[in-house]
């Protein structure tokens, strides 16, 4: 508060000066009136002199504080408060002088009837104001008209909370909250961004400053290499980025030619890789060069590269010490209000392990950074598991859920959970320019390559592989000494470099799935090299209800095959989804593949350029820190009614569309549903993942009572779910056709 001391002292000194001046002036007036009765000075003239002095003071004060957001709710000791104080002081002085003049006039003339310029009229001027001086002294605030709250679904609830809790932390009063609805509204619109800004309010200078720095695309990796060199944990990712550097540079240049990448705000972004911290107990970085899982490292390296090339300021953390150093300004801040001033970060990319570390490190300040989080989450987190109390009521004991974030803040490896956002990765092309020329000359052999580098994946698959072996050679890339489950006719190449694997795939006609691992990147790499993928069908579908692998994961998603993305979004002739236990079905697929000629195919979303486009759109358009959700645009909305027993994900998919959860809020009022020919004879609010829904017999609508429970997953047994679907760009399913 030291910053405001000069204003406070200045106003006190001026007040003292005015009181003294008024007293001396009054005495002089008395003396002058008695001595010079023939030329009485007008009280209005004297009043004008005092007002002129006050105007000069106010003008100087305004100049000193021109960068302060001023107004009736701007906080304590602002120019507005000083003006009100001065107004009260002047009014008091003028009233006293008016009484003094009246007494003098009575004393000299014996009556006040002939006084035409008496200041007794001054109080009537005050009465013309919206609020009287006495009201201001008693703390009454000016009324303000609240704007419409459409598009700000949380605003009303936040105002109700503030009415009960605004005294729980003195920081609210520091921001000008005084118990009135208008002060709540201004705080929630300008400090925490849950409500629309009042049109007459000036913009916060910090917000204005935020838009001064623009992002410029980068076309070299020097700064990023230097940044990542400090961490041995980043070695595998660093090597991947170096291998793909030329492709990335070409991609960012190509994207800049296709769409306008200028006038984008350069954002401060924290990237915290919890899985790579020593405290996590995982050894992903250590096993990366010896056959360990690479999916997370692939996704992280591609994300970091994209953020960097798009021109944002990134800071990378892979230890608790680094995290604390970056966030030290707010660590320990127990205030219920956000930290004032320049922001440390504006976006935070993190994983589930890092999420727990981040919350523990920040303590109470955590709540102010929740909306900035983007959580890398390969298998996804459905709303049912994300909502803490709802998950508890359903008996879910997963250690990965209950974060109470907007479900779209979870970023997945594939677009399998529409409630989440699809981040994806890049399918690497390991070849240099001379390789590319040579690879096109490679002739396809009558051979297949099995997708499974661990011996245990091959268990109980011999009959299935025998069918394939009847028609072609079977090759493998299994590592390790154990090969007991591998048939003797298989030609095992062991672990291959990325380059050698590409050449092997170019010689191969069929890439053979064994049913595990689920949803890996390898099938996409095979398809990109011209192989057909034999995709094992799961009947019944696999989920946490019947498969140990999914137990504990925060999703009830059902996998209909080893690779649902390839099944749904690619399909034939590149992907053949078959029942491994149906000999005829397998044989028919193998014969068809041998008789067809297919070209290499790579979905745009798994290229460098596709990922850059998608991440840029998310950074520019996705905003969970402000109440109004305007993206994707409403022009993309297509409303569908699901049949009982059918989820929104299913009904949208049947119509070649995607379920878009951000549109649910536009289908949660009776008047909104009328626009889409859904007429509610009656309605009620209910907190459940299966609503909004419609019961056609009675035309009864059930609307959502908790915004975090909007869900594309889940089927109602008797009601029709009211589903928000949207179109998508072929090869870029995360974006609608009007999204760019």
Swiss-Prot record:
InterPro entries: GT18_cat, MGAT5_Glycosyltransferase, MGT5A-like_N. It is a single-pass type II membrane protein. It is found in: Golgi apparatus membrane. Pathway: Protein modification; protein glycosylation. Substrate binds at residues 377-378, 553. One of its GO terms (cellular component) is Golgi membrane. Its main location: Golgi. Residues 1-13 are cytoplasmic. Disulfide bonds join 144-182, 155-195, 171-337, 371-625, 648-723, 652-725, 659-712, 680-701, 736-739. Residues 31-740 are lumenal. It catalyses: N(4)-{beta-D-GlcNAc-(1->2)-[beta-D-GlcNAc-(1->4)]-alpha-D-Man-(1->3)-[beta-D-GlcNAc-(1->2)-alpha-D-Man-(1->6)]-beta-D-Man-(1->4)-beta-D-GlcNAc-(1->4)-beta-D-GlcNAc}-L-asparaginyl-[protein] + UDP-N-acetyl-alpha-D-glucosamine = N(4)-{beta-D-GlcNAc-(1->2)-[beta-D-GlcNAc-(1->4)]-alpha-D-Man-(1->3)-[beta-D-GlcNAc-(1->2)-[beta-D-GlcNAc-(1->6)]-alpha-D-Man-(1->6)]-beta-D-Man-(1->4)-beta-D-GlcNAc-(1->4)-beta-D-GlcNAc}-L-asparaginyl-[protein] + UDP + H(+). It is an enzyme of class 2 (transferase). The keyword Glycoprotein applies. Its EC number is 2.4.1.155. GO terms for molecular function: alpha-1,6-mannosylglycoprotein 6-beta-N-acetylglucosaminyltransferase activity; manganese ion binding; protein phosphatase inhibitor activity. Glycans are attached at residues 109, 114, 117, 333, 432, 446. It holds the Pfam family MGT5A_N. Keywords: Disulfide bond, Glycoprotein, Glycosyltransferase, Golgi apparatus, Membrane, Secreted, Signal-anchor, Transferase, Transmembrane, Transmembrane helix. N-glycosylated. A secreted form is released from the membrane after cleavage by gamma-secretase. It comes from the Eukaryota. One of its GO terms (biological process) is positive regulation of cell migration. Changing residue 188 to R: In LEC4A; loss of activity. Belongs to the glycosyltransferase 18 family. PANTHER family: ALPHA-1,6-MANNOSYLGLYCOPROTEIN 6-BETA-N-ACETYLGLUCOSAMINYLTRANSFERASE A, ALPHA-MANNOSIDE BETA-1,6-N-ACETYLGLUCOSAMINYLTRANSFERASE. Catalyzes the addition of N-acetylglucosamine (GlcNAc) in beta 1-6 linkage to the alpha-linked mannose of biantennary N-linked oligosaccharides. Catalyzes an important step in the biosynthesis of branched, complex-type N-glycans, such as those found on EGFR, TGFR (TGF-beta receptor) and CDH2. Via its role in the biosynthesis of complex N-glycans, plays an important role in the activation of cellular signaling pathways, reorganization of the actin cytoskeleton, cell-cell adhesion and cell migration. This is Alpha-1,6-mannosylglycoprotein 6-beta-N-acetylglucosaminyltransferase A. It comes from Cricetulus griseus.
